[in-house]
Amino acid sequence: MARRPGVPAAYGDEFSFVSPLVKYLLFFFNMLFWVISMVMVAVGVYARLMKHAEAALACLAVDPAILLIVVGVLMFLLTFCGCIGSLRENICLLQTFSLCLTIVFLLQLAAGILGFVFSDKARGKVSEIINNAIVHYRDDLDLQNLIDFGQKKFSCCGGISYRDWSQNMYFNCSEDNPSRERCSVPYSCCLPTPNQAVINTMCGQGMQALDYLEASKVIYTNGCIDKLVNWIHSNLFLLGGVALGLAIPQLVGILLSQVLVNQIKDQIKLQLYNQQHRADPWY
């Protein structure tokens, strides 16, 4: 059948505006994070199942396992839209993926700006989280390990000072506290001992009963909030690099999905054009 003059041969039935490079690059991009999300969920669920029931209900707000599961599930759903949308060339799924990714990016950007502008309120929120974590220190093994790591990493003890540990029922200094750890602090507050082969987990025994000078000979007495703030100020470039590293994959995903959506729309227009002119004897 003769082709209408002026219609490019490249726009025949075999031509496609959809670039295989863009399509499969977006697919494998989402597949990678899809697998990562499933690993995150699996690790989070495993961590929850390994805990006792009472510990599992003790401190949901700061439980790292719960956080891992929630982030993993959200990432799974988001990357599912990206994977299937790119593979099936589904505009609805691709637009959903792009919109959700844009919202996540804007929320992260807003959180960073608000944290910088309202640094005092952010500091207060961090203090609240740390104090809540201190209260539930013995209730959650993951939380306990996280606090111990933070205190050793930043050479600190408690939120404001080492006496913050009195908020914990096991370390409380009240006379009616029957705990053997009464008026103590965790071993992670203790100053490191050179060439120590075995960790002395009782090194913080009775430290809250000592004054600042006496306690400073054995444990860290400064709180972790000030140490954390100082660390952030000293590593702004590093944190900026991490933020950029998180933002780049999101921006790439948004860009690729929008490019693919536009290509699919152009392909649909081409198919409609071919259908409308198929009955034309000069087509």
Curated annotation (Swiss-Prot):
Expressed, tissue-wise, as follows: Predominantly expressed in erythroblasts.
Sorted alphabetically, the keyword list is:
Cell junction, Cell membrane, Cytoplasm, Disulfide bond, Glycoprotein, Membrane, Transmembrane, Transmembrane helix
Membrane-side (Extracellular) residue stretches = 46-64, 118-235
Q: What is its main location?
A: membrane
Q: Which CDD domains match?
A: penumbra_like_LEL
Annotated membrane-spanning segments are 25-45, 65-85, 97-117, 236-256
Which subcellular locations apply to this protein?
Cell membrane; Cell junction, Adherens junction; Cytoplasm
The record's disulfide annotation reads 156-224, 157-189, 173-183, 190-203
List the carbohydrate attachment sites: 172
GO annotation (BP), single: pore complex assembly
Per the record, membrane topology reads: Multi-pass membrane protein
Q: Which GO terms describe its cellular component?
A: adherens junction; cell surface; cytoplasm; pore complex; tetraspanin-enriched microdomain
Instruction: Give residue spans on the Cytoplasmic membrane side.
Output: 1-24, 86-96, 257-283
Q: Name one GO molecular function term.
A: enzyme binding
| Matching InterPro entries | Tetraspanin/Peripherin (IPR018499), Tetraspanin_animals (IPR000301), Tetraspanin_EC2_sf (IPR008952)
The record describes its quaternary structure and partners as: Homodimer; disulfide-linked. Interacts (via extracellular domain) with ADAM10 (via extracellular domain). Interacts (via cytoplasmic domain) with PLEKHA7 (via WW domains); the interaction is dependent on PDZD11 being bound to PLEKHA7 and facilitates the docking of ADAM10 to zonula adherens.
- Family per UniProt? Belongs to the tetraspanin (TM4SF) family.
This chain's function reads:
Part of TspanC8 subgroup, composed of 6 members that interact with the transmembrane metalloprotease ADAM10. This interaction is required for ADAM10 exit from the endoplasmic reticulum and for enzymatic maturation and trafficking to the cell surface as well as substrate specificity. Different TspanC8/ADAM10 complexes have distinct substrates. Plays an important role in normal erythropoiesis. It has a role in the differentiation of erythroid progenitors. Negatively regulates ligand-induced Notch activity probably by regulating ADAM10 activity.
Recorded protein name is Tetraspanin-33
Say which species the protein is native to. Answer: Mus musculus (Mouse)
